[in-house]
Amino acid sequence: MKDDQLIDWIHERYEEQKSANRLAGRFRFLGLETKYSIISIISGIFIGLTAALLNALASLLNSFREGYCTVNILFDKQTCCSTLTEDYECQEFFFWRNNHSVFVSCLIYVSVSVGFAFIATTLGYVVAPAARASGIPTIKAILSGYKYPDMNVFFSIKTLCSKSLAVCFSVASGLWVGKEGPFVHIATNIIYLVERIAPSLADSEIFTRQLLAAAMASGIAASFNAPVGGVIFALEQLASSSFPSLFTGSIWYEFLCSASSVVALQLIRSWHTDVGYLSYVSLDRRWSYKDTLPFIFISILCGCLGSVLIYLNMKFASKTKGFSKISNVFFVIFLSLITSLTAYAILGESELLFNPMELFPQVINSCSPSSSTVLCETTFWVTAIVLFTSALLGLLLTSATFGAAIPTGIIVPSLAIGACIGRAVGTLLKSRFPSLAGTSIYGVIGSIAFLSSTTRLVVALVVILFELTGALNIALPLMLATLISKWVSDSIIETSIYDAWIQFRNIPYFPSSNSLKFSIPLNFPVRSPEQLVRLPIRSCSIEELERAMHDSSQSFFVVLKNDTEFFEGFISRNKVSELLNRRPMSSNMQTTDNTGLDPLRSASAPVDSTFDLFDYIHPTTFTLNYDTPPVLMLKLFKDAGITNLALLNHGKLHGVLTKIDIIEYAKKCKTHTGNTYSELPTGVTYETDIFNRADD
């Protein structure tokens, strides 16, 4: 990791205040907050329209795996089958399995699935590598202060178009992926591009990240038709990031962006009701306190299995990390082949749609007169076996697919797996105790419990399920399920699946204070003065600056009082480079040349030129006494958002502690957990694992 990979939030706040007038741009009669509010509203409208388009396209492509609409080939199965016969049959939709032999219909089903998976891999990995996977882990790290190597690639028109199409094909292929996580990346891409229309507004790292947080909220809101849940989702993700207090100002932008996206989505749905995700779930009866123990059991079971999914997913990620580009493509095709064969077998035997986008609403809804699936027409033990089998297969397929070379999301697969587990348990209990709540309620409880175990979210999930299902009468069971599931999963695996991927990609990520514990004193790896490049504050020669730039890759240099070890401050590498580039014109440059030559000749002549660095010192330098308790040092990094801290001994430099060093230290502690001190690497004493969990 490099020192310049993280943002110094205090310095950014300083620069923001200093350049407020410059950021005002051409529309000076509008305040900055008004301009960013307008950007949030405009972006939210585009996000809502994009969500409507992608939902419709994904649903249409998904229908082609089963057949096509004879009335209009551009109608998906749900639209085509809006009117049923007296026998609850859909005559307008041409099903492959009803009009061809088993072999031919299976061949068509599998071929379409594999073809869609290949297209998704080509678009989301070969054409635009930045479009692969979920996007939420990287965006969460960016919001925490991570400087993505090339933001203009991660947020670009090419990435936006490729990921938008790729996520539709990946979902339509039947793979166990969701589109909600990738859509968060799509939403942040939209707001980033809208902000870039006004370059004067795009210079602030703080405001840019506040808008990205608003887009994250809007992406979830548009995906689930849950504006309040989207806002809380973004806030809960930001609460576990470094310097979360910085984003308190983003709540307003999140609300505006989420509300405008859902309004745009609802306007489209007003004349095309099938656009969007779920709007309402029918639960068969109310719950009672007799259901509390089964709810607790389901929550514990989902907490354990969610941790198993994270463990297996990271194992698959480690195995496929060294794959070539061709190998990654073939791996996705192989997953699609296995998934489609399994789905077709389950579809033929039980009429159960084995893909998370359709399985989840099937499982959490009560049986209707038109229901012909195994959930409603067979004995309880057959239903339970099919549901448990579906959950187990879904868990294995999701753990192998999430993070593969296509746009992948974890939210809907987790909901589907948990719903199968919950309804299976409810079915078994209902057969023995008829007075218990309906099986669909158990499905909802299982879905939120499993999702909580994989993402470690609590409040956001409860609100999203409220808005998604309309089931306000099960508020208490939902809250109980998320809490128990999170506690259980925290005790098994420390990180959420998002933070596990942040660590897997070696992205520098500094969690919040709630994610840290201290059992014994810490010994942080402090950089000694001998390890640092030191420059004099007065009469610093060009040769010293050039030597510092050449001999060190550090993002900062230490400035000391001349001929002493007294600390004066930090100077950034960029500032030194800037000084060297404009040294002939620097007003703060002192020269001893008195030859009277013209500037061009003087620049090429041997001149003893020096700089006074006082005016170029980092204006937000933080210092502490060298014997300050490490807990307080860590608190300063977390609460102030700084990246470098100078440790002094009576004004003299004792060493420098950086945020990157703390992150590396924590990783080494985690690697050697359980070892004796004699087995740890030399140079630093690792006394405890300071990261208890990376997502709270």
Swiss-Prot record:
Keyword Membrane attributed: yes
GO annotations of cellular component type: chloride channel complex; early endosome; Golgi apparatus; plasma membrane
Gene3D superfamilies linked: Clc chloride channel
Membrane topology classification: Multi-pass membrane protein
Species name: Schizosaccharomyces pombe (strain 972 / ATCC 24843) (Fission yeast)
Domain CBS: 527-587, 617-674
Protein's recorded name: Uncharacterized chloride channel protein C887.02
Family according to the record: Belongs to the chloride channel (TC 2.A.49) family.
Summary of the function given for this chain in its UniProt record: Voltage-gated chloride channel.
GO biological process, any: chloride transmembrane transport
PROSITE patterns named in the record: CBS
Keywords: CBS domain, Chloride, Chloride channel, Ion channel, Ion transport, Membrane, Repeat, Transmembrane, Transmembrane helix, Transport, Voltage-gated channel
